[in-house]
Every structure is written in structure tokens, then in C-alpha cells.
A protein has these predicted regions:
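A generic structural signal for short beta-strands and their flanking turns/coil linkers
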Residues: 14, 32-34, 43-45
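Loop/turn positions that initiate beta-strands
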Residues: 5-6
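Conserved hydrophobic positions within beta-strands
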Residues: 16-18
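Short, solvent-exposed secondary-structure boundary/capping segments
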Residues: 24-35
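A short macromolecule-binding patch
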Residues: 37-52
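Charge/polar-rich, low-complexity and marginally structured segments
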Residues: 52-149
């Protein structure tokens, strides 16, 4: 269980600070469930999630892990879908983003950037889906690295 003040990675929200732990305070909630009250670091708003949620929630990486990851970036293999096709790529990228693993996100960014560079050299464009998942992966990875460092 996390404590108030902890920095956590919560699903698609990215890095959040645990503001408090307690009942939701909403009228339709019976008050029998305990919630984390989270504040995303890089956007406004508040997120309430049950303590026993199935959504991925983990502490941010340590400063040492962040520095090791940055040092290992040139050697990371690119992450790309095993199968061809838009649907396979979308499912592959979606699963990587949901896992919130920094090394996998960095490898995914590397793969999409290489794909973009190849497309530019050949007068083509990268798909909107690739651009959308690249943005999500960059936001998650860079946000967590910034919070850790």
C-alpha cells in the first residue's frame, strides 16, 4: 500500500502523487471502499482509484535505475510488432504502453523513431497511430525519468 506523498505510476495517467487515502466522499458511494486520491504531476485534475484496483500502479523508478536506463539507451533493441498490419501494431503498442515498463517504452520509442526516419528518407509518412503511441510513450517515459531524477 502506498502512503500520502508517494510518487506512483498509475495506468495511462503517468506519474501521480498520492494526496490522500480514504473514502471517496461521493454521495453515491456507500463509503465502505478505500480510495487513493491522486494528482497527476504533468496535467491538472484529480484521479480517485480504489486501493484494490486492477489497473497497474507502481512506485516510480529510483534515480539509480533511471541513470542506468539512460546509460543503456544506445544498446536497447527496438521494440516492434512481430506481425505486420495496423491492428497487430496497435495491439502491440497498446500493451507496451499499459505495462508502463521504462525499458520497453524506450525501446518502443527507438523503434518508431527509426521507422519515422526510414519513412522520411523514402518520402513517406508514418501512420497517425505510430505518432499517437510515440507521443504517449514519450510522455510516460520522460515524465517518469523527470520525476526520478
Amino acid at each position: 500500500m502506498f502512503a500520502a506523498g508517494d510518487l506512483v505510476v498509475y495506468g495511462g495517467e503517468g506519474v501521480c502523487r498520492v494526496e490522500s487515502i480514504g473514502p471517496s466522499g461521493l454521495a453515491y458511494d456507500g463509503g465502505d471502499k478505500v480510495y487513493y486520491h491522486l494528482s497527476p504531476l504533468y496535467r491538472g485534475g484529480t484521479v480517485m482509484t480504489p486501493v484494490d484496483t486492477a489497473v497497474l500502479m507502481r512506485p516510480i523508478i529510483s534515480r539509480d535505475c533511471a541513470l542506468k536506463l539512460i546509460a543503456a539507451l544506445p544498446a536497447l533493441p527496438e521494440q516492434k510488432p512481430a506481425e505486420r498490419g495496423m491492428r497487430a501494431a496497435k495491439d502491440f503498442y497498446h500493451q507496451l504502453v499499459l505495462r508502463c515498463d521504462c525499458a520497453e517504452l524506450a525501446a518502443m520509442i527507438h523503434g518508431i523513431c527509426r521507422k519515422r526516419a526510414w519513412a522520411l528518407r523514402h518520402g513517406k509518412k508514418v501512420s497517425q497511430m505510430d505518432e499517437r503511441y510515440l507521443k504517449r510513450a514519450e510522455d510516460q517515459l520522460y515524465g517518469e525519468l523527470a520525476a526520478a531524477l
